[in-house]
Amino acid sequence: MKKAVAFFAVMLIVLSVFSQNLFSFANNVSPHESKEKEYPEVLERFSVFKASKVEKRIREAEEARKRELERLLSEEKKRKRIEQTLSNIKNGKTSLRKVFANTCFVGDSLINGLETYNILNSDKIISQVSARFSHLEDNIKKIISLNPKVLILHYGINMLWFDDTGLGWFIDDYSELVKKLKKQLPHTRIIVSGIFPVNEEVATDGIFIRVPDHNLAIEKMCKEIGVEFLDSTELVLGCKEYYGSDGIHFSASFYSEKWLPFIVENKGIIG
């Protein structure tokens, strides 16, 4: 029994000395110093990783800033060219024929006016009085063969009479033809014009109240397909004096003084 007590006492003394030494060591060495001494390579790699990550973010920010600056400069340059083109048209220094030399206009009698009044080159105008989508379908091969830089379509007003059942068939047919053109002309800018509103005196006819809904549907179609939409509504409503006697078609000056410069300004077509 005495031996056991003596052994137990010795063990307590040993444990006490060990604990004091351990506590002293812990006080003299911080946790960070301990970790640094134990894992120097890991800490070094982590520091390099953090530095490279920061450098990467700085490079990305600089590249993004550079791209944004280039975009702004490009837009400013384009805006000045558009302004210069509009000024040259107004002053007679350049012709509409030259500006739209690489643009093909396709559509109904409202497009036909460009040829009737001899405003643009007839070889880039494909139009027909009272044209419907069948006209566009019949001329797809011809349009593709021209391979224009820009293609502007205007259809719809002649289908208002036959649209009692809603917009479904109208958009389905139009969409199918535009998709076909986009596939066959991958490098051509395709611009779909909304239907021109009619003179307010004619607008009382029931069929013409459908124009705004049709234009909204055409605009939505353009977004879904990935082509451009041209909304001339505000322009036309401000040009009442340019309507013909029927309140639907326009005078020559509407095209030369209003609509074509409007396209230059809003779509950046400068030749």
Q: Language-model features: where?
A:
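Conserved, well-ordered alpha-helix/loop/beta-strand core segments that scaffold catalytic motifs
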Residues: 152-156, 179, 191
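A short helix->loop->beta-strand "cap" motif at the edges of active sites that frequently abuts
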Residues: 185-189
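Catalytic His-Asp segment of secreted/periplasmic serine-dependent ester chemistry enzymes
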Residues: 18, 22, 198-271
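Charged helix-capping and loop-helix junction motifs
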Residues: 167-177, 208-214
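Conserved SGNH/GDSL esterase-like catalytic core that processes O-acyl groups on lipids
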Residues: 87-173
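Hydrophobic positions in alpha-helices of CheY-like receiver
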Residues: 177-181, 222
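N-terminal secretory targeting modules
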Residues: 1-100, 116, 270-271
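Second-shell loop/turn segments in exported
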Residues: 127-129, 159-168, 181, 203-208, ...
